[in-house]
């Protein structure tokens, strides 16, 4: 079975895209990241989240920049801490996006 990690349903969450198995929208996850939440803190505070779901939310935001423009820095990366290289190990290639999922190198 393949899980669609980001789901959009007009009858759920007013149609706002959300992470499968949670009541957290992509916007909620981006708000957490931009306020300084790391992946480990998100997973600790929201045990219903999954590593893959958070990465999919970031990737979804990257594909829908116009909808989530407030969360992008001037260099085009998502604001806030992303995945470290170690946290990104094991993610599928489509989610290993520098600046979007993986925090940019200084």
Describe the function of each predicted region.
Residues 24-106:
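Long, charge-rich, low-complexity alpha-helical segments
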């Amino acid at each position: 079975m393949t899980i669609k990690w980001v789901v959009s349903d007009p009858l759920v969450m007013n149609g706002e895209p959300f992470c499968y198995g949670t009541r957290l929208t992509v916007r909620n996850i981006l708000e957490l990241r931009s306020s300084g939440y790391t992946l480990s803190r998100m997973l600790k505070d929201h045990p219903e989240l999954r590593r893959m779901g958070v990465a999919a939310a970031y990737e979804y935001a990257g594909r829908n920049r116009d909808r989530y423009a407030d969360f992008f820095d001037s260099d085009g990366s998502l604001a806030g801490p992303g995945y470290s290289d170690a946290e990104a190990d094991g993610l599928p290639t489509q989610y290993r996006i520098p600046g979007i999922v993986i925090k940019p190198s200084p």
